[in-house]
From Swiss-Prot:
Pfam families on file: Thioredoxin (PF00085)
Keyword Signal in record: no
Top-level lineage group: Eukaryota
Region called Disordered, residue ranges: 1-20
Active site (UniProt): 55, 58
Site-annotated residues for Contributes to redox potential value: 56-57
CDD domains: TRX_family
Protein family per UniProt: Belongs to the thioredoxin family. Plant H-type subfamily.
Protein name according to UniProt: Thioredoxin H2-1
Predominant subcellular localization, coarse grouping: cytoplasm
Keyword annotations: Cytoplasm, Disulfide bond, Electron transport, Redox-active center, Transport
Amino acid sequence: MGGAFSTSKPKPAAGEEGGESAVVAVHSKAKWDELWDAHKNTTKLVVIDFSASWCGPCKMMEPVFKEMAGRFTDVAFLKVDVDELAEVARTWRVEAMPTFVLARGGEEVGRIVGADKDELEKTINTLRSSSSSTATTT
């Protein structure tokens, strides 16, 4: 009796699933265009992870990026494979992986090249707090 309880998996904590923000992997130019069009005219911060499947530092940053997406639910997190979407990577002048581009209102507002978790988090926090003061309407 009780065996069903011992084999059941614990439910995720609040906010771990179904939140407004999660990493959205973009696998086509059409999907990129759709997502970019949805965000480029807003004040929402967008963090784009340009990576490659063969890139060791990119793999190291993947769980960090997912964890940040779970915490920063007011930020959009997109993941682009540079081999899959080379045209998008060229548009954003990506030359090394991982490259994290932070954008708001269709413009780049920050960039971190390399697997620098602390710098990425610091930059996201800085830009998140600056959006609350710049997001006021007249």
